[in-house]
A protein has these predicted regions:
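Beta/alpha (TIM)-barrel catalytic core signal, keyed to glycine-rich beta->alpha loops juxtaposed to Asp/Glu
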Residues: 1-166
Length: 166
């Protein structure tokens, strides 16, 4: 209902499509937040609308356990697979699950450090999100210079997660 009233019935989506056609919008997409019916509906119109990207929440918890975090969420594995089927690039939000994946308990941190002692805990989450081939970009909120430096080490160049690490 919100999609219909905010973007469809008032002509907003038609306006955005015309702006893209006129060259004032280069890439048109949407950010998905929760309602799977809306996600599926918008993707079902991809042949007509030609989405340039879709922003989804993807991290190693939400990959198969999204509903355990929030019952309204959909597993990122499903969301990503639907984008891949349609050749729509994914923009990734929440790779750290609101920072929670950068602050693990001692047992989990020790397991990660045992495998890759030089890497931060956050870098594991970024590497996971960046491993998938149809990911256009991974968004990262950075507050401090050390966050930026860690991100540069993680993504320059990105070392994808191995099968074992998955």
């Amino acid at each position: 209902e919100a999609l219909r009233s905010r973007y469809l019935d008032n002509g907003m989506l038609d306006f955005l499509l015309k702006e893209r056609e006129a060259g004032r919008i280069r890439n048109l997409g949407f950010s998905y937040h929760g309602d799977i019916e809306v996600f599926d509906y918008l993707l079902s119109r991809h042949d007509e609308l030609k989405w340039n990207f879709v922003q989804i929440q993807l991290n190693y918890v939400d990959w198969r356990h999204a509903k355990e975090v929030n019952t309204r969420n959909t597993d990122a594995e499903y969301l990503y697979a639907e984008l891949v089927k349609r050749n729509i690039p994914a923009v990734i939000m929440e790779p750290l699950l609101g920072g929670r994946l950068s602050r693990l308990n001692d047992h989990l941190m020790a397991r990660l450090k045992q495998r890759r002692p030089q890497e931060s805990v956050a870098s594991w989450a970024f590497r996971f999100a960046g491993t998938f081939p149809d990911v256009l970009t991974v968004l990262s909120g950075m507050t401090y210079m050390e966050h930026l430096q860690d991100n540069l080490r993680t993504f320059s160049p990105l070392v994808p997660c191995t099968e074992e690490e998955f």
